[in-house]
Amino acid sequence: MLSLKSEVLARHLPLFNGKSILLFGNVRDRFADQIRSISSHVAIFSHYFDYARHYNDVEFGLDCTTPANLGVFYWTKNKQECHYQLLQWLSQTAIGQQMLIIGENRAGVRSVEKLLSPFGQIAKIDSARRCGLYHFELQTIPQFDCQKFWKSYRLADLTVLSLPAAFSSTELDAGSQLLLSSFTNQDRLTGNVLDLGCGAGVIGAYLKQRFPAISLTMSDIHSMAIHSAQATLAKNKLTGTVIASDVFSHINDRFDLIVSNPPFHDDIDTAYHTVESLIMQAKNHLNYGGELRIVANAFLPYPDLLDKAFGSHQVVTKSNKFKVYSARV
């Protein structure tokens, strides 16, 4: 099934005839299969491991250096993430590079005109399915400096480093703050700890700094988050393993604590499947006596899921907006 963005691209198949194509950005479907027969080559690059892990022809990573006659970028709601990906790839190309940018209007795709107009000619060529499609031709190669995209902030003695797409990238969010406050010196954490959906790594790094005896693993689906968490550990001289995993897809160990501030937004839509998978599968990755501790908006229907998976749960602490839940094996 094609996304709305790919449905718009499918209205312009002659643009792909005989060309080498690169699909990148927030690619979420198999539009590539529709254009293979008319293109000379189709490559796919993704920052999203939950997509890339399902297909052998998708390259997962941070920076894309794949050349193509025509780049096709799928816009996402995070503008800084889009800026990073577009400018990084265009800085590797040559004058005359052709590109299509497709995105939903509600995700702010219109701002691509302001972003790319200093570097060439950009024009909207279609508007359908609540999306905008733009054509761009490069006239001035942008100077890409990755360091300009890194942000940092302090949490007590901890320095958090992050790239745009990492959750908690510019400050500690209220949910994570409540979650961290739920850990006291009485917890005396030891053993294996997993920070699942780690974002910039603030939760796992904070726990490792406060409880040095733990063996820390952090995971996320986004390459920017993985690099951010690695940088946060290195900056604070902390040890830990950071891996790409779609919930538990690439996690084989068992843990004494699984901690998470799980996402419930999929791009600009609300989706609960990730948290459902986390709660329902966590028991299989906990040692006997192990704990799952998560924070969530108070209105979300997670208590029933926790009771279904674990038999019972506790509310460790709460605020007007969030609750911290605990469930044990």
UniProtKB/Swiss-Prot annotation:
Molecular function per GO: 16S rRNA (guanine(1207)-N(2))-methyltransferase activity; nucleic acid binding
Keyword Hydrolase included in the entry's annotation: no
Cellular localization per UniProt: Cytoplasm
Any single Pfam family the record assigns to this protein: MTS_N
Superkingdom field: Bacteria
Disulphide linkage map: none
Cellular component per GO, a single term: cytoplasm
EC numbers for this chain: 2.1.1.172
Family in the record: Belongs to the methyltransferase superfamily. RsmC family.
Subunit structure: Monomer.
Record's protein name: Ribosomal RNA small subunit methyltransferase C
Native source organism of the sequence: Haemophilus ducreyi (strain 35000HP / ATCC 700724)
